[in-house]
């Protein structure tokens, strides 16, 4: 990252970005659209099936068979919203650390927080990555979250 950087390597913003981008649970919003939609569908399907099975085994199928599917849609959307929020919070934390001119860190874990001012070279590099790599992921997550919340709201209205 730089010749003199007092931050431990795992707390450096660029390394945090690379770790997050290589993580299986966090990298799929930065993938191609086809892979992104596949994972969205997978998460939604898991939530739908769990909710569907729970409502099915509560004997609601006999009384209100259509409500099982509506509850499944609500459950799938709810699980998807929780996952998208988790992803958004993780990526926005990394974006904030990349775009910031100062970085707070702890050397020993004894709550002795320090602040390091980035050099201009490191700041330019981090901001370029934040603007051109992380912000598009955040925008994609925001748009997806908005659409899923609209679908959930519409489903709740028709129920």
UniProtKB/Swiss-Prot annotation:
Species of origin reads: Cyanophora paradoxa
Pfam families in UniProt: CGLD27-like (PF06799)
Q: Which family does it belong to?
A: Belongs to the ycf36 family.
Task: Identify the GO cellular component terms for this protein.
Answer: cyanelle
Q: List localization entries.
A: Plastid, Cyanelle
Keywords, ordered alphabetically:
Cyanelle, Plastid
Annotated protein name in UniProt = Uncharacterized protein ycf36
Coarsely, its chief localization is plastid
């Amino acid at each position: 990252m730089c010749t003199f950087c007092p931050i431990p390597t795992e707390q450096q913003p660029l390394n945090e970005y690379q770790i997050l981008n290589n993580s299986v649970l966090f990298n799929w919003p930065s993938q191609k659209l086809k892979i992104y939609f596949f994972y969205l569908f997978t998460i939604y399907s898991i939530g739908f099936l769990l909710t569907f099975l729970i409502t099915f085994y509560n004997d609601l199928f006999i009384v209100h068979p259509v409500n099982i599917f509506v509850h499944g849609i609500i459950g799938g959307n709810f699980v998807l919203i929780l996952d998208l929020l988790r992803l958004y919070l993780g990526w926005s934390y990394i974006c904030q650390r990349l775009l910031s001119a100062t970085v707070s860190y702890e050397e020993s874990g004894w709550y002795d927080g320090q602040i390091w001012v980035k050099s201009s070279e490191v700041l330019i590099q981090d901001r370029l990555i934040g603007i051109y790599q992380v912000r598009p992921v955040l925008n994609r997550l925001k748009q997806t979250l908005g659409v899923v919340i609209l679908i959930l709201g519409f489903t709740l209205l028709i129920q």
